[in-house]
């Protein structure tokens, strides 16, 4: 396979076709170079967002799907880090017109990921919510398209701005919920540590020699079980919350990066217009200075009277 460079990566993603061999070959190459996954994900997302053809976007989504499924064994973090970009690409589909092909592909992928447990239920739920927005988007023109139709510079869609605000709010809420997580609760761990090891280690049950010991152990087990199940449940919720926080942070970083790119572009455009205005002003000043001084050439010439002007007009 070809050596990894950013140029090679862009070329492979651009030349991607809907043939299964093209998808699989590209996916295998990306997995082989998983050490560059941060760059791969960033370039992949930019390629998706530059595309306006539904078929091209579908091909890119299928590559992401193949990478995510095959990365579970070779590089699980590749799949986890890919999710925010996949969600962002789904949101990009909302801005497309006549994106039935993309909408169908998104629905199909979500079902596959849910059935095969590629992504967590909460992640699949978020993708499903975006999918519903894609379904509804066909009836409403986007602000960016409307601006292009009127010959104006396209502004970033309001949806992206609202998405960034929502990401920030979600991050703050997650951080607030994780201020006192179950994993830091000393009391419950101290309480559980009071029980003998026999109730959590089956091998040590062999040391039980009498029915009285077995009965005592059973009572302790029944007493500890509800407490342990409740604690494990809260720990699981904490883990899910941390996964959600990680996804929201990655999405927030991507939105901030997009915002920076937009404002840098805006600054360059303002600077270009400022330079043009200064050049025009300088040209006007030069033209003004080159005009003859009528007062100096005819200092004593009287101005014509109003009657003389009317008489001249009648003639």
From Swiss-Prot:
Source superkingdom: Eukaryota
GO terms, molecular function: RNA polymerase II complex binding
Keyword annotations of the record: Coiled coil
Coiled-coil annotated spans: 227-273
SMART domains: RPR (SM00582)
Domain called CID: residue spans: 1-135
GO biological process, one term: mRNA 3'-end processing
Pfam families: CID, CREPT
InterPro entries named among the record's database cross-references: CID_dom, ENTH_VHS, RPRD1A/B_C
PANTHER family: CID DOMAIN-CONTAINING PROTEIN-RELATED, CYCLIN-DEPENDENT KINASE INHIBITOR-RELATED PROTEIN
Name assigned to this protein: CID domain-containing protein 1
Name of the gene this protein is made from: cids-1
């Amino acid at each position: 396979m070809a050596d990894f460079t950013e140029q090679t990566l862009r070329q492979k993603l651009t030349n991607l076709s809907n043939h299964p061999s093209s998808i699989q070959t590209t996916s295998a190459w990306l997995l082989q170079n998983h050490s560059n996954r941060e760059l791969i994900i960033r370039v992949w997302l930019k390629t998706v967002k530059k595309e306006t053809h539904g078929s091209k976007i579908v091909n890119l989504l299928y590559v992401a799907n193949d990478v995510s499924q095959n990365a579970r064994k070779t590089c699980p973090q590749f799949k986890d880090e890919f999710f925010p970009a996949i969600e962002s690409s789904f949101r990009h589909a909302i801005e497309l017109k006549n994106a039935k092909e993309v909408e169908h592909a998104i629905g199909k992928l979500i079902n596959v990921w849910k059935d095969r447990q590629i992504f967590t239920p909460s992640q699949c739920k978020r993708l499903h919510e975006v999918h519903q927005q894609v379904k509804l988007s066909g009836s409403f023109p986007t602000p960016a398209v409307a601006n292009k139709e009127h010959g104006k510079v396209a502004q970033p869609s309001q949806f992206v701005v609202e998405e960034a605000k929502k990401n920030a709010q979600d991050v703050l809420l997650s951080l607030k919920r994780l201020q006192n997580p179950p994993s830091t609760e000393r009391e419950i761990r101290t309480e559980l540590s009071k029980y003998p090891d026999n109730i959590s280690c089956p091998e040590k049950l062999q040391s039980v020699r009498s029915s009285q010991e077995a009965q005592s152990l059973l009572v302790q087990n029944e007493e500890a079980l509800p407490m342990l199940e409740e604690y494990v449940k809260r720990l699981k919720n904490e883990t899910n919350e941390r996964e959600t926080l990680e996804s929201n942070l990655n999405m927030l970083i991507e939105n901030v990066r997009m915002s920076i790119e937009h404002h840098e572009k805006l600054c360059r455009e303002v600077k270009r217009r400022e330079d043009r205005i200064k050049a025009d002003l300088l040209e006007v000043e030069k033209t003004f200075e080159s005009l003859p001084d009528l007062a100096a050439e005819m200092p004593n010439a009287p101005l014509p009277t109003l009657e003389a002007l009317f008489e001249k007009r009648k003639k």
